[in-house]
Regions:
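Beta-rich strand-turn-strand
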Residues: 78-85
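Structured, basic alpha/beta domains of bacterial-type, RNA-associated proteins
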Residues: 4-12, 16, 22-27, 31-73, ...
Length: 145
């Protein structure tokens, strides 16, 4: 008579910002957070770490009941931080199935749960009129006189 081990609750979520993609795995635990297999204390600089901890602070005790492992790739450090932040918030809402937490996140910052579709405009070819290679809408300045 061998007791069957209860299946552990595991949640997989993603977060995106600009070109950065964060995949998070959330399991019951003691509040450890790893980004690319390194503790959160080693991530970026202090303002980025504080920004990353916002969903955890808003969640309160729930953040101390889960371990979060995040894998982030592409984009820059700020985009990666925002993607990881979104993945943490989505994962905590899905893990707790708490509508109040979801509403709290939506009131605090909608981008914690909702994808931001804004993108950089691609460069247009230099089609006459002095179009520059510096930007998609930049043109050579013309004098009126």
């Amino acid at each position: 008579m061998v007791k069957k081990k209860e299946k552990e609750k595991v949640i997989f979520v993603t977060g995106k910002r600009k070109t950065a993609i964060a995949r998070a795995k959330i399991v019951p635990g003691v509040g450890r957070i790893f980004i690319n297999k390194k503790p959160i204390e080693l991530w970026g600089n202090e303002p980025l770490r504080l920004w990353l901890r916002e969903p955890l602070i808003l969640a309160g005790d729930l953040a101390k009941q889960v371990d979060i492992s995040i894998n982030v790739k592409s984009g820059g450090i700020v985009g990666q931080t925002e993607a990881a932040r979104q993945a943490i918030a989505r994962g905590l809402v899905e893990f707790s199935k708490n509508e109040e937490l979801r509403n709290l996140y939506m009131q605090y910052d909608r981008n914690l749960l909702v994808y931001d579709p804004r993108r950089n405009e691609p460069h247009h070819s230099a089609s006459g009129k002095g179009a520059s290679k510096r930007g998609s809408r930049r043109h050579k300045q013309r004098s009126k006189r």
